[in-house]
Amino acid sequence: MSKIDSIIEMIEGLNVLELVELKKKMEEKWGVTAAAPVMAMGAAMPVAAAGDGAAAAAPVEEKTEFDVILKEAGPNKIQVIKVVRELTSLGLKEAKDLVEGAPKPVREGVSKEEAEAAKAKLTEAGAVVEIK
């Protein structure tokens, strides 16, 4: 029998209070925690309480405002500048600076439909676009 197997057998023989004490001592000794890792940006779904049973999950908020981000102008920079001017009402110099300074937001806080339309126009002109 290996050391690991004998340790497992010893742990199996412990009661709940002894297991809690073992956990605390391991956390103190090695500076670790037995807590479950927390997922970033709310990726983990909320879990219903054990005794509750009828607890509903929190409703997921649907995003209503989107940003259109120009990642790169692509080979047709002049066409992209024209589309940026059309979408933003910027002057020629400002639109050129925006396109050359990519990645930059072209439209911010717009509806999904407006964001999709802007992305379609920019992509048609040869730009690489992302909606956030």
From Swiss-Prot:
InterPro entries: Ribosomal_bL12, Ribosomal_bL12_C, Ribosomal_bL12_C/ClpS-like, Ribosomal_bL12_oligo, Ribosomal_bL12_oligo_N_sf. The keyword Phosphoprotein does not apply. One of its GO terms (biological process) is translation. One of its GO terms (molecular function) is structural constituent of ribosome. Keywords: Ribonucleoprotein, Ribosomal protein. GO terms for cellular component: cytosolic large ribosomal subunit. The keyword Cell membrane does not apply. Forms part of the ribosomal stalk which helps the ribosome interact with GTP-bound translation factors. Is thus essential for accurate translation. Homodimer. Part of the ribosomal stalk of the 50S ribosomal subunit. Forms a multimeric L10(L12)X complex, where L10 forms an elongated spine to which 2 to 4 L12 dimers bind in a sequential fashion. Binds GTP-bound translation factors. Belongs to the bacterial ribosomal protein bL12 family. This is Large ribosomal subunit protein bL12. It comes from Chloroflexus aurantiacus (strain ATCC 29366 / DSM 635 / J-10-fl). The lineage of its organism: Bacteria, Bacillati, Chloroflexota, Chloroflexia, Chloroflexales. The gene is rplL.
